[in-house]
Amino acid sequence: MLKRIKIVTSLLLVLAVFGLLQLTSGGLFFNALKNDKENFTVLQTIRQQQSTLNGSWVALLQTRNTLNRAGIRYMMDQNNIGSGSTVAELMESASISLKQAEKNWADYEALPRDPRQSTAAAAEIKRNYDIYHNALAELIQLLGAGKINEFFDQPTQGYQDGFEKQYVAYMEQNDRLHDIAVSDNNASYSQAMWILVGVMIVVLAVIFAVWFGIKASLVAPMNRLIDSIRHIAGGDLVKPIEVDGSNEMGQLAESLRHMQGELMRTVGDVRNGANAIYSGASEIATGNNDLSSRTEQQAASLEETAASMEQLTATVKQNAENARQASHLALSASETAQRGGKVVDNVVQTMRDISTSSQKIADIISVIDGIAFQTNILALNAAVEAARAGEQGRGFAVVAGEVRNLAQRSAQAAREIKSLIEDSVGKVDVGSTLVESAGETMAEIVSAVTRVTDIMGEIASASDEQSRGIDQVGLAVAEMDRVTQQNAALVEESAAAAAALEEQASRLTEAVAVFRIQQQQRETSAVVKTVTPAAPRKMAVADSEENWETF
């Protein structure tokens, strides 16, 4: 039955039983403590009542004694034989004692009453107290008034005896209550001890039952599981694991049995995998050796290619430098042609200015020729007029003739100058035309030189681009050479790793040989696992070889 109950449920039941025992014992102890508290309260109340009532009784007795002494002193003073304290001092002392009695009585009445105390007895003692107290107060008044006869005639002793009787009865009643409370305390203590013993017996019985249940449902299955775990740790995977019960221990045993089965399968797979790894590592080592040889050949080819690229880079750089110098020379020629074109433009402008000035001079000469013609006409008119004047106008005619001659010579000179100016203007026009033609030619030269300069610049730029491209190709080839060298090193490391893997596979095979599993399962797994990986590895090596040959 215990094997079918879950451990958690068992623990909850144990906790519930212990909790119930704790609650039961706690309730019983609480009841005992409650009774003890009530009895202690009764004892405390009785003690306080007795203390305050006794204080009031003593104060009343002291008041009466003081009043008796005061009365005697009063009588002695009347006979002139007194000495010691005066009547006034004794009466004051009696008043103080009476007030103390009143205070103690007030404290007594303020205390709570136990239900078991007699109400009639309390009322009777209060009545006798009031009588005795009032009698003492009356004695103080009588003695103060000098009524000594009434003072001694008062039956104070009877009042005192009555109060004392009730006081003794009340004290006897409190003593009985005190004895009852003590007896109840003793009974509560005995009951608590019996409860403690009973609870201890029940707890011991529950502990024994719990231990028996734990041993049957937890310890024994745990020992069996520990023994199975030790066999598994020793490499024995064949010994069966017993599953008994459906509680947590049964589930743990079932899980351990499942783990044993999985471990058997895993160990078989590890053995087969180790064999496959050993075979694959051998193939990898062979392929790596072949790959290492081809990598070395490829590295040598890349070194030759890198050397050729360096020579080609040097040649292209030299061509780029020559193209750059030719571009600079063409640029210089273009600048010179541009300056020549500017000079020709200036000459053309100057020739145009000269042509304009010559035209202006021709215009001025035309004006001079007109003036000479008009002067000649005027001289002719003057000669005609002088001829008409006869002898008187002869001198004027001579002058007019000279003026006419001068006008004719001026006209002749003007015509010659005009002819020369016109010839000069014609030549200047021809020169201007030639200079303009030369300017256009210089512009064409400048344009051609500019195009040549642009072409040379493009050639130089292309040469620079080619140089940079060849540099990049050289860097790429160098990087390929470096990567090839690294690949060669990695191939060597891979070969070493394959050898190490082969050794580790051998060690792994030796390590898993410690475990004992079913022979049939091991052989079946070995056949399946060792045959399948061979073809992919071969094809991987072939692909690698084809890639290297193509590269």
From Swiss-Prot:
Residues in Methyl-accepting transducer domain copies: 273-502
Membrane among keywords: yes
Family: Belongs to the methyl-accepting chemotaxis (MCP) protein family.
Alphabetical UniProt keywords: Cell inner membrane, Cell membrane, Chemotaxis, Membrane, Methylation, Transducer, Transmembrane, Transmembrane helix
Residue ranges occupied by any HAMP domain in the UniProt entry: 216-268
Region (The 3 Arg may form a positively charged pocket, which binds the alpha-carboxyl group of the attractant AA): 64-73
Membrane topology: Multi-pass membrane protein
Disulfide feature: none
Subcellular localization, as worded in the UniProt entry: Cell inner membrane
Chief place of localization: membrane
One Pfam family hit: MCPsignal
Residues with the Glutamate methyl ester (Glu) modification: E304, E493, E502
Protein name: Methyl-accepting chemotaxis protein I
Molecular function, one GO term: transmembrane signaling receptor activity
Cytoplasmic side: 1-6, 211-551
GO cellular component terms, semicolon-separated: methyl accepting chemotaxis protein complex; plasma membrane
GO process annotations (BP): cell motility; cellular response to amino acid stimulus; chemotaxis; detection of chemical stimulus; protein homooligomerization; protein trimerization; receptor clustering; regulation of bacterial-type flagellum-dependent cell motility
Job description of the protein: Receptor for the attractant L-serine and related amino acids. Is also responsible for chemotaxis away from a wide range of repellents, including leucine, indole, and weak acids.
Matches recorded under InterPro entries: 4HB_MCP_dom_sf, Chemotax_Me-accpt_rcpt, Chemotax_Me-accpt_rcpt_Me-site, HAMP_dom, MCP_chemotaxis, MCPsignal_dom, Tar_rcpt_lig-bd
